[in-house]
Protein backbone atom coordinates (compact mmCIF):
# COMPACT_ATOMS: atom_id res chain seq x y z
CA UNK A 1 0.00 0.00 0.00
CA UNK A 2 1.01 3.60 -0.50
CA UNK A 3 -0.45 6.80 0.91
CA UNK A 4 -2.62 9.08 -1.23
CA UNK A 5 -4.69 11.90 0.20
CA UNK A 6 -3.83 10.82 3.74
CA UNK A 7 -5.12 7.26 3.19
CA UNK A 8 -3.28 4.02 2.52
CA UNK A 9 -4.37 2.71 -0.86
CA UNK A 10 -3.73 -0.87 -1.92
CA UNK A 11 -2.00 -1.16 -5.27
CA UNK A 12 -0.37 2.28 -5.39
CA UNK A 13 2.94 0.83 -4.23
CA UNK A 14 3.13 -0.96 -7.59
CA UNK A 15 3.87 2.42 -9.19
CA UNK A 16 2.72 3.83 -12.50
CA UNK A 17 2.69 2.33 -15.95
CA UNK A 18 6.07 1.16 -17.12
CA UNK A 19 7.16 3.81 -19.58
CA UNK A 20 10.94 3.65 -20.12
CA UNK A 21 10.68 5.27 -23.57
CA UNK A 22 8.73 8.30 -22.24
CA UNK A 23 5.74 7.63 -24.52
CA UNK A 24 3.21 10.49 -24.37
CA UNK A 25 0.12 8.47 -23.38
CA UNK A 26 -1.56 5.14 -22.64
CA UNK A 27 -2.61 3.11 -25.61
CA UNK A 28 -2.82 -0.24 -27.29
CA UNK A 29 0.03 -2.67 -26.53
CA UNK A 30 1.02 -2.92 -30.19
CA UNK A 31 1.21 0.86 -30.67
CA UNK A 32 4.73 2.33 -30.70
CA UNK A 33 3.54 5.62 -29.17
CA UNK A 34 2.01 4.01 -26.05
CA UNK A 35 3.57 3.04 -22.73
CA UNK A 36 5.63 -0.13 -23.01
CA UNK A 37 3.76 -1.45 -19.96
CA UNK A 38 0.32 -1.17 -21.59
CA UNK A 39 -1.10 -4.67 -22.00
CA UNK A 40 -4.15 -6.05 -23.83
CA UNK A 41 -7.43 -6.89 -22.12
CA UNK A 42 -7.54 -10.04 -20.02
CA UNK A 43 -10.77 -12.03 -20.04
CA UNK A 44 -11.62 -13.47 -16.62
CA UNK A 45 -14.39 -15.94 -15.82
CA UNK A 46 -17.03 -15.39 -13.12
CA UNK A 47 -15.00 -17.51 -10.69
CA UNK A 48 -12.01 -15.15 -11.07
CA UNK A 49 -9.86 -17.47 -13.17
CA UNK A 50 -8.32 -16.92 -16.58
CA UNK A 51 -6.45 -19.26 -18.89
CA UNK A 52 -5.94 -16.78 -21.74
CA UNK A 53 -2.36 -15.89 -22.58
CA UNK A 54 -1.43 -12.22 -22.30
CA UNK A 55 0.34 -11.09 -25.45
CA UNK A 56 2.77 -8.22 -25.13
CA UNK A 57 4.26 -7.87 -28.62
CA UNK A 58 6.67 -5.07 -27.73
CA UNK A 59 8.25 -6.85 -24.76
CA UNK A 60 11.11 -8.98 -26.02
CA UNK A 61 12.81 -10.43 -22.91
CA UNK A 62 11.63 -11.43 -19.45
CA UNK A 63 14.50 -9.37 -18.01
CA UNK A 64 12.65 -6.23 -19.17
CA UNK A 65 9.93 -6.80 -16.57
CA UNK A 66 11.95 -8.49 -13.82
CA UNK A 67 11.24 -6.82 -10.47
CA UNK A 68 8.08 -5.11 -11.76
CA UNK A 69 4.42 -5.52 -10.83
CA UNK A 70 1.53 -6.66 -12.97
CA UNK A 71 -1.64 -4.73 -12.19
CA UNK A 72 -5.00 -6.11 -13.30
CA UNK A 73 -7.92 -3.70 -13.12
CA UNK A 74 -11.54 -4.73 -12.86
CA UNK A 75 -13.76 -3.54 -15.71
CA UNK A 76 -13.12 -2.56 -19.29
CA UNK A 77 -10.22 -0.58 -20.65
CA UNK A 78 -10.58 1.92 -23.47
CA UNK A 79 -6.75 2.23 -23.77
CA UNK A 80 -6.90 5.93 -22.95
CA UNK A 81 -5.34 8.39 -20.52
CA UNK A 82 -8.92 8.99 -19.36
CA UNK A 83 -10.31 5.51 -18.60
CA UNK A 84 -14.00 4.98 -19.20
CA UNK A 85 -16.33 1.98 -19.06
CA UNK A 86 -16.71 0.13 -22.33
Swiss-Prot record:
Keywords on record: Antioxidant, Copper, Metal-binding, Oxidoreductase, Periplasm, Zinc
Residues forming coiled coils: none
Reactions catalysed, as given in the entry: 2 superoxide + 2 H(+) = H2O2 + O2
Cellular location(s): Periplasm
Stored InterPro entries: SOD-like_Cu/Zn_dom_sf (IPR036423), SOD_Cu_Zn_dom (IPR001424)
Recorded family membership: Belongs to the Cu-Zn superoxide dismutase family.
Quaternary structure annotation from Swiss-Prot or TrEMBL: Homodimer.
Name of the molecule in the record: Superoxide dismutase [Cu-Zn]
Amino acid sequence: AKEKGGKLTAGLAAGGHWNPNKAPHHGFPWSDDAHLGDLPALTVLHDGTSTNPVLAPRLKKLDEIKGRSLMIHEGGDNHSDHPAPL
